[in-house]
Amino acid sequence: MGGAQVLLLLTLLGTPLVTHGTPPLVVDPSIGSQLGLGSVLGLDLGSMGGSGRPPCRPINVTVAVEKEECPQCMAVTTTACGGYCRTREPVYRSPLGPPPQSSCTYGALRYERWDLWGCPIGSDPKVILPVALSCRCARCPIATSDCTVQGLGPAFCGAPGGFGGQ
């Protein structure tokens, strides 16, 4: 392996993979031609999203809605964002920290109001839920979303009466 090829290989190993758009072109001086990054590394970058994995999109979900002052949960069917987004896992530790990861989150949304059953007189039975109109892959907005690896799940009901009065 010549010096230029070793330098090219070291440069490629230290370069993070492209996660969107057209792969950059790399010129190999020993060949004198342009090669796509995927060709040099022997990867098919077009299929890294994984065939068979559903993309980020609005999906119908049933969630448990509850309020602290109301004794029961109510199952509500709404639209949320779900599916896969392309992520990167570094092969080396960077002093800059890990690369930002994207998750499937709301692009556009509207809000719907639901009234819970069995709430005591004088309490507010109204609950407002977001409804996904469109979704996108972006950094998880931790101020408004559950960005944990595995949350409680949409059907979790912590009310003492469980699901009642449907």
Curated annotation (Swiss-Prot):
Q: Which residues, renumbered to this chain, are glycosylated?
A: 60
Q: Under the cellular component aspect of Gene Ontology, which terms does the record hold?
A: cytoplasm; extracellular space
Write the record's keywords in alphabetical order, separated by commas. Disulfide bond, Glycoprotein, Hormone, Secreted, Signal
Signal peptide range in chain numbering:
1-21
Q: What SUPFAM superfamilies is this protein classified in?
A: Cystine-knot cytokines
Domain of life (superkingdom) = Eukaryota
Compartments annotated for it: namely:
Secreted
Specify whether Secreted is a keyword of the entry: yes
GO terms, molecular function: hormone activity
Q: Name one GO biological process term.
A: response to testosterone
Asked if the record carries the keyword 4Fe-4S, the reply is no
Name the CDD domains on file.
GHB_like (cd00069)
Read off the Pfam families from this record. Cys_knot (PF00007)
Q: Which cysteines are joined by disulfide bonds?
A: 56-104, 70-119, 73-157, 81-135, 85-137, 140-147
* UniProt cross-references to InterPro entries, sorted A to Z: Cystine-knot_cytokine (IPR029034), Glyco_hormone_CN (IPR006208), Gonadotropin_bsu (IPR001545), Gonadotropin_bsu_CS (IPR018245)
**Family to which the UniProt record says this protein belongs:** Belongs to the glycoprotein hormones subunit beta family.
As for what it does, the entry says:
Promotes spermatogenesis and ovulation by stimulating the testes and ovaries to synthesize steroids.
Subunit details: Heterodimer of a common alpha chain and a unique beta chain which confers biological specificity to thyrotropin, lutropin, follitropin and gonadotropin.
Q: What is this protein called?
A: Lutropin subunit beta
Q: Which organism is it from?
A: Coturnix japonica
Q: What is the lineage of its organism?
A: Eukaryota, Metazoa, Chordata, Craniata, Vertebrata
